[in-house]
UniProtKB/Swiss-Prot annotation:
Name under which the protein is recorded: LPS-assembly protein LptD
Signal sequence region: 1-24
Protein's cellular compartments: Cell outer membrane
Subunit record text: Component of the lipopolysaccharide transport and assembly complex. Interacts with LptE and LptA.
PANTHER family registered for this protein in UniProt: LPS-ASSEMBLY PROTEIN, LPS-ASSEMBLY PROTEIN LPTD
A GO-annotated cellular component: transporter complex
Organism the protein comes from: Yersinia pseudotuberculosis serotype I (strain IP32953)
Name of the gene this protein is made from: lptD
Length: 780
């Protein structure tokens, strides 16, 4: 054993070092077997360029023909033809200025130009047009992957087209025939960057696995109608899956992708995506349609062969520099859609689908936005009580430099309706004039602000809601007027650091006083308001709640201190911030929730954030919040990440949310997993482990529930012309109320991808990491 130890140690060291280089760059590896054109390019009209012929022996019948034998080299411009024997024929046609010059070559014929190399036993070439034929030969593209053979190879239109009779095409390097496409006719169009194949047979090795009377393969990044690279995978949930996307280049500003997605256990899904570019902006529309899902039986288990669908519309644009249009609309057929079916337009962790339309106008000192907002919540209770704002009008008017003051007026009008007819509905009108006195210089600033918050509610309260004693007692008409006063000051001190040449440290104390009087708001229902997360920057917010339904009283001072360190290139290397809110009187709105029912005053809320970029590869980031009203640490997170490059990364993280904070932020939570709080520790990593092999993994463990929250491991092998990855994922998808246990979904999947048809040669680690229920997010 002792004798073997040095060998084992050397092997481990070699593997670690080799994985760091992985032949340095897979793209460079894949170009090792690709020919390049390394001669100086000749410019000018090819037909006007001279023809140069070298040979061991020449027999000429001037000017009609000549026979060259022995190491024959024919050159014209950037084209070169070599052979054992070449016959040059020249025919002067009546009315033609330039004679027709052709060559017939036999014996070890080779043709090359900046785009392609041809090789065969016999060939013919028109020196005027560069049309070239090679019998029973082989070809290889120059400067990019792509090769094959054919009974007859033709070059046409100055080598734009390569036409093969009974030919093959593959992106694999010479000596590797892992896959190929065979056709009775194959046409490669270099300008359009596409290969068209008739009577196509797709082969893995020597075994044909797929037939199509016609097929297109893209061999570049140019937009072109045709079939894209197929994809196959297997999951325990869906069985064998096969996707064959078709790209439709409709017009310069329109295109679409139509993808039949076969799932062995569920059926055939059609994934359709349409993209456009118009004067009002650009956008994407998508419709995924699964007409008869053989597994899904609906929320109540009685809907057999249910039709499942997804519709998405995303749009963003500016027109005439003043009009702004935005759409973010996603709707699915059922709450379990993202749990069962994979989509780039949502995931189970979102919890809801957003449906927002906005149209806005912006001028020099005012803007207006008209919007429609609705949410499809994926929990039964949430979806049955969701509210929509249809319509909502927001307006802003700005007037700066009115003497020493800046003015701002914000107004809103919104109509709230509920998907549940037994819930209250309301019209809300709000106006918020603000006057600021900003003062600043090179080392500090102070801003004094006064505003008036005036809101009117006209509520429609159903009788069934009003008669329920457990519901709040609402009023049909409510007026709420609240003044607000704020003073916010900050000073920045900086100094050069003695122990680090060129480094600068700053010290930035900040203090803010905020006053808002108390107003009991129990007579107003909650339509669009939730408790906001309180991190360090949140200490200096005006509001405790989002929306306008709850405006908490305030008589408080927020203080904070931030220190930053910049290197000699002014890159921030370190910062730390800590702050607190001191309450002179308790903050309240009138309701009886835990966070609002405390009589405590003094320093109640503390928050801190820190970030440390140790070097360009290693960094730390974290934050914590403490609320004495809840008597606990409310939120916390910490991340340490080492990222060497796009494929080499290790991240450790921890996140925490106290049960009291969750109950205060989301009062109606019945899942025991959340009622006891969140305390999750996890790690995410990706690393090449050997030549062309890469592994990724993610593991999150809930220390409160004492169970894994998510597990992911993936292994990918990459070559120059194909890649395969195998992955396993286990994730929580719901709560089993009957068994009082978490529901898990186990997924085993594999994907096969053809490589070399475009410029990408990544190891695929990013795609694998983003496929998990908790996608990787960079820490810095």
């Amino acid at each position: 054993m002792k004798k073997r130890f040095p060998t084992l140690l050397a092997t481990l060291i070699w593997t670690a070092l080799y994985s760091q280089h992985t032949l340095a760059d897979l793209a460079e590896q894949c170009m090792l077997g690709v020919p390049t054109y390394d001669q100086p390019l000749v410019t000018g009209d090819p037909n006007q360029l001279p023809v140069r012929i070298n040979a061991d022996k020449t027999e000429a019948n001037y000017p009609d023909n000549a026979l060259f034998t022995g190491n024959v080299i024919v050159q014209q411009g950037n084209s070169t033809l070599t052979a054992n024997q070449v016959e040059l024929t020249q025919v002067q046609k009546p009315g033609e200025v330039i004679p027709l010059r052709t060559v017939t070559a036999t014996g070890d014929v080779n043709y090359d130009d900046p785009q392609i190399k041809l090789k065969g036993p016999k060939g013919w070439s028109n020196l005027n047009t560069k049309d070239t034929d090679i019998d029973k030969g082989k070809y290889q593209m120059v400067g990019r992957q792509g090769r094959g053979d054919a009974d007859l190879m033709k070059l046409r239109d100055q080598s734009r087209y390569t036409i093969l009779k009974n030919g093959t095409f593959t992106s694999c390097l010479p000596g590797d025939n892992s896959w190929s496409v065979v056709g009775s006719e194959v046409i490669h169009d270099r300008e359009e960057q596409v290969v068209e194949v008739w009577n196509a047979r797709f082969k893995i090795g020597k075994v044909p696995v797929f037939y199509s009377p016609y097929m297109q393969l893209p061999v570049g990044d140019k937009r072109r109608s045709g079939f894209l690279i197929p994809n196959a995978k297997f999951t325990s949930n869906n069985g064998f899956e096969f996707l064959l996307p078709y790209y439709w280049n409709i017009a310069p500003n329109f295109d679409a992708t139509i993808t039949p997605h076969y799932m062995e256990r569920r059926g055939l899904q059609w994934q359709n995506e349409f993209r456009y570019l118009l004067a009002p902006g650009s956008g994407t529309m998508a419709l995924d349609w699964l007409p008869n899902d053989r597994i899904y039986t609906g929320p109540d288990g009685t809907d057999k062969n249910a039709t499942r669908w997804l519709y998405y519309w995303g749009h963003s644009g500016v027109m005439d520099q003043v009009w702004r249009f935005n759409i973010n609309y996603t709707r699915v057929s059922d709450p379990a859609y993202f749990t069962d079916l994979t989509s780039q337009y949502g995931s189970t962790t979102d919890g809801y689908a957003t449906q927002i339309f906005t149209a806005g106008y912006a001028n020099e000192n005012w803007n207006a936005t008209l919007s429609s907002k609705q949410f499809q919540v994926f929990t039964a209770a949430g979806n049955s009580n969701a509210y929509r704002a249809q319509p909502q009008l927001d307006m802003n008017y700005y007037k700066n430099d009115v003497g020493p003051f800046d003015m701002h007026v914000y107004g809103q009008a919104a109509k709230f309706t509920s998907v549940n007819p037994t819930n209250p509905e309301a019209s809300r009108f709000h106006i918020e004039p603000t006057v600021n006195l900003p003062l600043s210089n090179s080392w500090g600033s102070i801003n004094t602000e006064a505003k008036l918050l005036a809101t009117h509610y006209q509520q429609d309260i159903p009788a069934s809601f009003a008669d329920n004693a457990s519901n709040p007692k609402l009023k049909d008409s409510v007026n709420r007027v609240l003044p607000q006063f704020k003073v916010d000051g900050k000073v920045v001190f900086d100094r050069s650091m003695d122990w680090a040449t060129g480094f600068t440290q700053t010290l930035e104390p900040r203090a803010q006083y905020l006053y808002v009087p108390y107003r009991n708001q129990d007579d107003i229902y909650i339509y669009d308001t939730t408790l906001m997360q309180s991190d360090y920057s949140g200490l200096f917010r005006d509001r405790t709640y989002s929306g306008l339904d709850r405006i908490a009283s305030a008589n408080q001072v927020s203080t904070g201190l931030t220190s930053r360190i910049y290197d000699d290139a002014r890159v921030e290397r370190f910062n730390v911030s800590v702050g607190q809110i001191y309450y002179f009187s308790r903050s309240r709105t009138g309701n009886t929730e835990a966070i609002d029912n405390s009589n405590d005053t003094g320093s109640l809320v503390w928050a801190g954030d820190t970030f440390w970029r140790i070097n360009d590869q290693l960094g730390l980031k974290g934050g914590a919040q403490y609320d004495t009203r809840l008597g606990s640490l409310t939120l916390g997170n910490a991340i340490m990440e080492y990222r060497r490059d796009a494929d080499r990364m290790i991240q450790l993280n921890y996140r925490y949310a106290s049960p009291k904070y969750i109950q205060a932020a989301v009062p109606k939570v019945y899942n025991p997993d959340y009622q006891q709080g969140i305390s999750q520790v996890g790690t995410t990593a990706s690393w090449p482990i050997a030549d062309r092999w890469a592994i990724v993994g993610a593991y999150y463990y809930d220390t409160k529930a004492k169970q894994p929250a998510s597990q992911l491991v993936g292994l990918q092998y990459n070559t120059c012309c194909w890649a395969v990855n195998l992955g396993y994922e286990r994730k929580i998808t719901g709560w089993n109320a009957q068994g009082q246990t978490s529901k898990y979904d186990n997924k085993i999947g594999f994907n096969i991808e053809l490589r070399g048809l475009s410029g990408g040669h990544s190891l695929g680690t990013a795609q694998m990491l983003n496929s998990g229920i908790l996608p990787y997010q960079s820490a810095f």
